[in-house]
Amino acid sequence: AWVTSDSLTFIGVIGAVLFAVGGILAHIDTKFLWLASLGLVINWYGDSLDGTLARVRRTQRPVYGFFIGHTLDALTTCLICLGLGLSPMMRMDVAFLILAGYLCLSIYTYVCTIIINEFRLTYGKLGPTEVRLLLIAVNTLYIYTPWSAIHYNIYGRNWGLFDIIGCTVAAILFMFYISQFTKDRRALALKDPAKPWHP
């Protein structure tokens, strides 16, 4: 009974902090990326169960829950991407590119919630849970494969293989954003057509 939705949300934030700490400590030993992966599991636990607990107990607070849940989601997303950029795995500019793509999709989700009363968690087949699983897989590959040593010189700049993977992920996020925007813009233009202007 002592566990509340707010405490689960806070646990999710702690998980994101652990991810960032694990990423930084990976400069000492790459096995600290396991701490980062544990942080993602903890983040998933808190983020997935806070709303579920409220529904089971019938203590939903739609306005407060939406406010707390999604403002802290933005914070945890920033912490996770900072952890990526501060780790030996990925350049900070690549991590920020992923952050920009993810936040664009998040903002798009919130706009659609208000405009068309549809809350989308998944784009394509990619949702928050799939993103966490992808990050855990990337951490594991970095620890146990020689891929971390693969680097390319592109236009005079050094790019690691995981930087290229990060850029690919960012491109996919922006592709989902542009694709869904194009589709919804057409539908909304028909639903809310332009009014004729008479000077």
Regions found by a protein language model. Name each.
Residues A1-S37, G83-P199:
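Hydrophobic alpha-helical transmembrane segments
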Residues F32-L82, Y108-C112, T182-R186:
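Acidic (Asp/Glu-rich) catalytic motifs at the cytosolic membrane interface
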